[in-house]
Amino acid sequence: MKIIIALLIFSIIIIFHELGHFWLAKANGIRVNEFCLGLGPTIFGFTKGETKYSLKLFPFGGACMMEGEDDDSSDERAFNKKSVWARISVVAAGPIFNFIMAFVFAFILVCNTGYDIPEVVEVSEGYAAAEAGMQAGDVILEMNGKNIHFYREVSSYALFHEGESVEVTYERDGERYTTTLAPKYDEELGKYRYGFVGGKVVQGNLLQNLKYSVYEVKYWIDTTVGSLKMLVTGGVTLNDVSGPVGLVDAIGDSYEESVSYGYYAAFLQMLYISILISANLGVMNLLPLPALDGGRLVFLIIEAIRGKRIDPDKEGMVHFVGLMLLMGLMVVVMFNDIRKLFL
């Protein structure tokens, strides 16, 4: 059951990503030859109009295959016959649709569970917060100039800036205060602490829920970007990275744990995970790497600036090399995921 749930979540997110490309392609008069879910040989398919819709053997990934996207075509409705701005809109639509999906799911989640405001609930003696005079009821507004909307953002900031001092702006009784906190290592918990605990959950009205749904998506975008920075700087290693196999396992474990509290709790937990994955997929696809949407956008933006398209053969070669490297990375990550399952 847990594998089915995980594959269903992946499928919904991937289909919506590809629908972004599909709908914008149609809106710009581009011929779509095939719209598929999965990779590899076709298991099932049918043709409606000019487009073939198919289900592939391997249940990871998907594609919106447009006429003339990767090769020359004399068809006036080919991708490369359209204006550079039309092509930019089609390529960017996939990641943007991921963020839209994350927002919709976040709104449903926030309406049902509320959101954690960054209000201090308890201050621990012997740590910087108590020494600075912070009290329960203080609301964290900024950390080193970064706006804070959820208490989770405090924890994330501490993770991405472990052991670093931070300038905290907080509010008490309508007045703003600023102090600098130097974290102290907690031997028992095995981490650095500023010395306060929060996480008060509140229920908002419609407008507040809409606003905090945007913040929810922003939170996961920031978390993804912060994690990528840690990967580049060595804060995390490839052993800490999970691919499809690892995510399926994590989703399955999360489902089995949450369903013990009822199907409603499991539904909300799956929504939470879907927000994370959808926002993550949007960010990853916007990375300026060959073969990804972000890599294609780089070439299109260069074309828009210089007013002339880069040699299609050279661009195709760059994307091909990038795809091979990406596939190699996926194999490494998948092997690592499988290895961790048996540890």
Regions from the PLM with identified roles:
Residues 3-8, 88-89, 100, 270-274:
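Hydrophobic alpha-helical transmembrane segments
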Residues 3-74, 284-292, 297-306:
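Small-residue-rich helix-interface/hinge motifs
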Residues 10-14, 65, 98, 102, ...:
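Alpha-helical transmembrane segments of multi-pass membrane proteins
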Residues 51-54, 58-122, 328:
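Internal alpha-helical transmembrane segments
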Residues 129-151, 217:
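Conserved PDZ fold ligand-binding element
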